[in-house]
Amino acid sequence: MKYFVVLVVLALILAISVGPSDAVFIDILDKVENAIHNAAQVGIGFAKPFEKLINPK
């Protein structure tokens, strides 16, 4: 989650500093951020069944 917050902050700083003319960089950074977020969600989805096997309630 920390990496996601760092990427959001960096995207905001970059968006403010470059302005609307260089929005391509923001688009690329946004796509990378979304890919990392989706990968983290998939990883959590894979980990939950193993967690339930190890720690049954």
Swiss-Prot record:
Entry keyword annotation includes Ion transport: no
GO cellular component, one term: extracellular space
Pfam families given in the database record: Cecropin
Signal peptide: 1-23
Consequence the record notes for mutating residue 9 to F: In strain: B316
Tissue spec. comment: Ejaculatory duct of adult males.
Keyword Secreted attributed: yes
Biological processes, Gene Ontology terms: defense response to Gram-positive bacterium; innate immune response; male-specific antibacterial humoral response; response to bacterium; sexual reproduction
Induction comment from the UniProt entry of this chain: In response to mating.
InterPro entries in alphabetical order: Cecropin
Keywords per UniProt: Antibiotic, Antimicrobial, Immunity, Innate immunity, Secreted, Signal
Similarity annotation: Belongs to the andropin family.
Function, as annotated: Male-specific peptide with moderate activity against Gram-positive bacteria.
Name this protein carries in UniProt: Andropin
UniProt organism field: Drosophila melanogaster
Lineage, highest ranks first: Eukaryota, Metazoa, Ecdysozoa, Arthropoda, Hexapoda
Gene of this entry: Anp
